[in-house]
From Swiss-Prot:
UniProtKB keywords: ATP-binding, DNA damage, DNA recombination, DNA-binding, Nucleotide-binding
Keyword Nucleotide-binding tagged: yes
InterPro entries: AAA+_ATPase (IPR003593), DNA_recomb/repair_Rad51_C (IPR013632), DNA_recomb/repair_RadA (IPR011938), DNA_recomb/repair_RecA-like (IPR016467), DNA_repair_Rad51/TF_NusA_a-hlx (IPR010995), Hlx-hairpin-Hlx_DNA-bd_motif (IPR003583), P-loop_NTPase (IPR027417), RecA_ATP-bd (IPR020588)
UniProt function note: Involved in DNA repair and in homologous recombination. Binds and assemble on single-stranded DNA to form a nucleoprotein filament. Hydrolyzes ATP in a ssDNA-dependent manner and promotes DNA strand exchange between homologous DNA molecules.
Family listed: Belongs to the eukaryotic RecA-like protein family.
Organism: Methanococcus maripaludis (Methanococcus deltae)
Tagged with keyword RNA-binding: no
Cross-referenced PANTHER family: MEIOTIC RECOMBINATION PROTEIN DMC1_LIM15 HOMOLOG, RECA/RAD51/RADA DNA STRAND-PAIRING FAMILY MEMBER
Residues annotated to bind ATP: G105, M106, F107, G108, S109, G110, K111, T112
SMART domains: AAA, HhH1
SUPFAM superfamilies, alphabetized: P-loop containing nucleoside triphosphate hydrolases, Rad51 N-terminal domain-like
Protein known as: DNA repair and recombination protein RadA
Amino acid sequence: MADVLTELPGVGPSTADKLIEGGYLDFMKIATATIGELTDIEGISEKAAAKMIMAARDLCDLGFKSGVELLKQRQSVWRLSTGSTELGTVLAGGIESQSVTEFAGMFGSGKTQIMHQTCVNLQMREKIFADLEGVVEEELEAPKAVYIDTEGTFRPERVVQMAEGAGIDGQTVLDNTFVARAYNSDMQMLFAEKIEDLIKGGNNIKLVIIDSLTSTFRNEFTGRGKLAERQQKLGRHMATLNKLADLYNCIVLVTNQVAAKPDAYFGVAEQAIGGHVVGHAATFRFFLRKSKGDKRVAKLYDSPHLPDSEAVFRITEKGIQD
C-alpha cells in the first residue's frame, strides 16, 4: 500500500507511512482531502499537500462529467424501504443511496424507530438491489450497517423485535450492525471517519446512521460566542458523511433535534438544529410529528427532485407500518 502512494510527487516511504497512519490509504482519499487536512500530518507542508492532492486527482481522473455520464451514475442508486408504503411513495421508492437523509422532530416523533427499522430492512436484500441490473443475489455479501449512537437510544432487543415482525432472524441483523457510542463531537466525528477503514477491511457497509446528528455539538458549543466554531465543525462532519455516501454508494441517515421557532405565526413552530450548514448538506429533509395514538406524520420539505409531500405511518410492536 505504501509503495502505491510513493507514486505521488514528494512522497517517499516515510511520508507514505504517515499518510496511511492518518487514514489516507489510497489516491481517492488524498484527492478528496483538503490542504489543511494533509498539513495536520507531521512533516507535510502546504506546498507538498497541494502537489499531492493535484497529482491524486489526476490519477483518479476527477473532473467534469457529461450529463449522460451522471445519468448513468444515477442508475447505480439503490433504495431502502422504511417499512411504510406511504413513506416509500413520498420518496419515489425508498431512501436513496449516494445521499444524506435527515429526519428531524421532537422526542417521541419516531426518529430512532425509523433508524432501527432501516437496520432490519437492510438485511432484506431483495429490496435493496432489485433495481440493479446484472446482480445475482446469491453472490452478494451481506450488507452491513453502522449505527453511531450519541444519545444512548440504540436498543438491540427492539431490533430483534422488529426483525421478528418482518420474518427475518434478529441475530443476523445484529451480527451485521456495527454500533458505536459517541459521548462527544470528537468521538462522533472520529467514528464517522473510521467507517472507511471498515469498508477497506472487507465490510460491505451500505447504511450509516447518526442518531442524533447535533446533540453532542449542541451540548458542547453553547452560546452565540461558540456558534461559528460549532458550525464549522459540523460542516466538516457533514462533508465526511456526504463523501461516504457518494464514494461507496451507501445510504446515510441522520436524526436531528428541533428548537422552538418563536417568530412562526403559522405552520410548524419548530426548526431543525444546525442551520444552513445542515440544510445545504442534507439531500432529503423530513420533519416528523406525532399524531393520534401510534400514528406519526412525515413531511418531506426539501429534496433536489421530489415535491413537498406528507406520509402517515404507524409505530407498532412489529415496527414501522402503514
